[in-house]
A protein has these predicted regions:
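Short, small-residue-biased leader/transition segments that mark boundaries at the very start
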Residues: 3-10
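C-type cytochrome heme c attachment motif
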Residues: 16-19, 36
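Acidic/glycine-rich beta-solenoid
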Residues: 24-36, 49, 53, 75-80, ...
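Hydrophobic or amphipathic alpha-helical targeting/insertion segments
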Residues: 67-122, 482, 489-493, 500-503
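Alpha-helical repeat/alpha-solenoid scaffolds of the HEAT/ARM/MIF4G superfamily
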Residues: 102-141, 147, 154
Length: 504
C-alpha cells in the first residue's frame, strides 16, 4: 500500500545524516543491501560512506580540514589510496593514487598537506610539485598549475611550444597534465584568459600526437560569439573549423553556423522562441528541415511537428485516462504527412509508475490494437521492475508476446532475468536474449559496477580508478577497450572482432 512505502532518515544528535533506510529495508532489514550509511569524526567531517550493495569508502582530512586521502572498496582490495595535494591557497595541484599503509594515512590529520612548486623537473611525476606528506609509490593522474605560465619549460610541455600568456592569470588555472588511463601517455594543456578572466585560448596535446587549439570570442554579456578549433597532427598538417553563434536581445541562442577550413559556412540550426521564452521552432541544415514545438499552459511539451515526423503528447486530454501530475496519458505520432497515426495509451499505478502501454493505430487508436503493447507486471518497494511483457511481430502477419521477463534482485542490483516467452521477434527484431539460466547471471565489483552479463556473453568488464569501463570481454574472444584521460573524457575505442581490431 502507499502507506507502507516509507523511507526513514536517521540523524545523530548534531543533525548529521547517518542512515537512509529506503522502503525495501522495511521488509528485508539488511543494512548491506539497502542502507545508506554515513559516519563523521569529532569535527563533523564525513569519514565513512557506504552505499547499498557496495563496500564502504573512507575519507581522511588534513589539519586544514581538506580531503587528502580517500579509498573505495576496489582500491582497498589493491591496498591503494587516492591522494590530493593542495597549494597554500587550498587549490588541488596533484591527484593520484599511492600505496601508503592505512596507519600512515591516518596520520595526515596531524599536519597540513601542501604541495610546493620547485625548480626543475623534480617532484611528483617530474611536475615540480613536492608533497609535504610522504607518499609511497605515487602514481600521478592530474597536475594543475595556477597563476603563471612558468610551467611551459617543464618536462613534457617544452615539446609543444606553448606560448607565454599576455594577460595576467592570477587566481586561474593556467596549465594541467592529465594521464591517460590505459596507456603510459599524458595530455598537456594550457588555458589563456582575457582581462575579464574568460578563457580565450585553450591548447591541448593529443594522445596520438599533435595539438588541438580552441580560440573563443565573447560578446559583451559573456556569451561565446565564435569558437575556432584548429587541429594539428604530428606531421604539422592543420585543419580548422569555426562555430559562430548568434543571440537575440535576451541572450538566447538563435543561430549556430559551422565553417570547415575555407569552405562556405553552413547554418546548422536556427532557433525561434515564443513570447514566454519557450523554444518554438528549430530549423536545421540551412533551414531545410524545420521542427515546431507546442506547449500547454503549464509549459509541458504537447506537440512536435516536422516534415518527416510529428508527435502529439496528451496529459489531461486525449484518449487515455487524464493525468494531472505531468505523466503522459497518451501519445500519437506520424512519420510523414500522409502516414497513419500510431500511438500508445498509458496507465500508471498510484505511485505514478508506468504499468501499461497499449498500442493502437488510426485517429482513435482502435485499429491493429495490442500489436506492440508493453506491460510492467510488478514493482518491488525500491521501484525496481519485477516483471515485464513486450508484444511484437512474431511472423510475417502475426503478433504476440516476444518478452515475458521475470527479474530478480539482490538489493537494488539485478541478479537474474528469465524469459518465459516461447516466441521470438520476427526477422531478428529487437527482443531480450535470454542467453543463460543461472541463479546469478550478473555480477558486480565492490563499487557496484557490473562485471559480468552472462545473458550477453560478457564474461568480464574491467574498470579504471574513475569507475569507467576500460575493457569489455566476450566469451567468443571479442573485446572492446576504452582509453580515457584523467578527467573521464573518452579518447579512444578499440573493437577486437575475430582477431581484427578497429580503432576509433
Amino acid at each position: 500500500s502507499l502507506r507502507r512505502q516509507r523511507q526513514m532518515c536517521i540523524r545523530d544528535r548534531y543533525g548529521n545524516l547517518v542512515f537512509v533506510l529506503p522502503p525495501g529495508y522495511q521488509d528485508h532489514p539488511d543494512l548491506d543491501l539497502y542502507a545508506y550509511i554515513y559516519r563523521y569524526d569529532y569535527l563533523d567531517r564525513l569519514v565513512y560512506k557506504k552505499l547499498p550493495g557496495c563496500a564502504p569508502s573512507y575519507l581522511v582530512y588534513d589539519a586544514a580540514h581538506r580531503l587528502v586521502f580517500s579509498q573505495d572498496g576496489c582500491q582497498r582490495n589493491d591496498s591503494l589510496w587516492s591522494f590530493f595535494v593542495y597549494d597554500i591557497y587550498g587549490r588541488v595541484v596533484v591527484e593520484g593514487e599511492c600505496s601508503n599503509s592505512d596507519k600512515h594515512v591516518r596520520t595526515a590529520g596531524e599536519t597540513v598537506v601542501l604541495g610546493t612548486l620547485m625548480e626543475g623537473d623534480t617532484g611528483l611525476a617530474y611536475s615540480g610539485y613536492q608533497s609535504s606528506f610522504d607518499l609511497v609509490d605515487p602514481c600521478v593522474y592530474v597536475v594543475n598549475y595556477y597563476d603563471t605560465y612558468d610551467f611551459r619549460t617543464r618536462n613534457g610541455f617544452s615539446a609543444y611550444n606553448f606560448p607565454e600568456g599576455t594577460v595576467s592569470a592570477i587566481g586561474n588555472l593556467t596549465g594541467s597534465i592529465l594521464c591517460t588511463h590505459g596507456s603510459s601517455g599524458f595530455i598537456y594543456s594550457a588555458d589563456y584568459y582575457d582581462s575579464n578572466k574568460r578563457i580565450v585560448k585553450s591548447l591541448s596535446s593529443r594522445v596520438n600526437g599533435g595539438m588541438d587549439t580552441y580560440a573563443t570570442e565573447y560578446s559583451f554579456q559573456g556569451s561565446p560569439l565564435s569558437v575556432l578549433h584548429t587541429h594539428t597532427d604530428s606531421s604539422g598538417y592543420s585543419l580548422t573549423e569555426r562555430y559562430t553563434y548568434t543571440y537575440d536581445h535576451s541572450s538566447r541562442l538563435t543561430r549556430v553556423s559551422h565553417q570547415y577550413d575555407n569552405n562556405p559556412s553552413v547554418l546548422l540550426v536556427e532557433h525561434t522562441y515564443d513570447e514566454l521564452g519557450r523554444l518554438q521552432t528549430d530549423k536545421l541544415d540551412n533551414g531545410i528541415y524545420a521542427t515546431d514545438y507546442a506547449y500547454n499552459i503549464r509549459n509541458w511539451l504537447t506537440g512536435i511537428e516536422g516534415g518527416k515526423f510529428s508527435q502529439s503528447l496528451h496529459y489531461t486530454d486525449g484518449l487515455g485516462v487524464p493525468c494531472y501530475n505531468g505523466n503522459i496519458s497518451s501519445m500519437t505520432w506520424k512519420s510523414g504527412a500522409g502516414a497513419t497515426p500510431r500511438g500508445y495509451k498509458f496507465s500508471y499505478d498510484r505511485l505514478g509508475r508506468l504499468t501499461d502501454a497499449e498500442y493502437g493505430e488510426g485517429p482513435s487508436l482502435s485499429v491493429n490494437t495490442n500489436r506492440f503493447n508493453e506491460q510492467v507486471t510488478g514493482y518491488d518497494k525500491m521501484g525496481n521492475i519485477l516483471g515485464l511483457k513486450r508484444y511484437g511481430q512474431t511472423s510475417a502477419t502475426g503478433y504476440d508476446v516476444i518478452d515475458d521477463l521475470s527479474l530478480s534482485y539482490a538489493g537494488n542490483r539485478l541478479k537474474k532475468v528469465a524469459d518465459r516467452s516461447g516466441t521470438s521477434a520476427f526477422n531478428n527484431g529487437f527482443e531480450f536474449k535470454d542467453g543463460i539460466d543461472l541463479p546469478a547471471e550478473y555480477e558486480y565489483d565492490e563499487n557496484g559496477n557490473l562485471t559480468k552479463d552472462l545473458n550477453k556473453n560478457i564474461t568480464a568488464i574491467q574498470y579504471n580508478c574513475l569507475n569507467l569501463p576500460s575493457r569489455v570481454m566476450f566469451a567468443n574472444g571479442n573485446s572492446i577497450s576504452y582509453l580515457y584521460d584523467a578527467a573521464g573524457r573518452k579518447l579512444r575505442t578499440v573493437h577486437v572482432l575475430e582477431g581484427d581490431s578497429v580503432t576509433t
